[in-house]
């Protein structure tokens, strides 16, 4: 849902790539607006809810101009908070990559693997593409990733949730923000063993 690459952006009518997962969610909200009344629902009282990565999706929907007016309340659970400015400025504190940053990393990884055009990338298959970042990082000693999360692309996502919150441009809806017990607890051993640079 979030793969970026300059050639994917070039073939897009909007000139961007990535954020496909968010576009799918926006399309689901469009469907709800058109059809939910037939099931007894109220298209003027739609609440979006997400936990962990789903909470990250809710944060992106709250920032995206393409989702405006399609929901009326938002619940965000265990999706991180708003980082302080000093952390936002650092690479570790960066909440959202820009499209250009994400495309650069994806292109670097694909080029390294010899997948230098869309035809080769598409022929490689999902499993190969999914494993490339891990293989590339192990072979190169780098920490480059083909993003698995939304990017600031100037179309679907204009700025990070943090920056939108600070500038007051998030969706003007009631929010419930919290956390769940033991979110990502199964990943704790791996996180604890991860060496920070």
For the regions a language model picked out, list residue spans one by one.
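Short, hydrophobic alpha-helix immediately C-terminal to the catalytic nucleophile
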Residues: 29, 59-63
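Short secondary-structure junction motifs
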Residues: 41-44, 71, 115-118
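Cap/lid segment of the alpha/beta-hydrolase catalytic domain
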Residues: 1-26, 34-38, 86-90
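Alpha/beta-hydrolase fold nucleophile elbow
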Residues: 32, 39-52
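Substrate-access "cap/lid" subdomains that shape
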Residues: 59, 68, 77-78, 82-197
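Catalytic nucleophile loop
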Residues: 54-58
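Active-site catalytic pocket residues across diverse enzymes, especially alpha/beta-hydrolases
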Residues: 36, 65-66
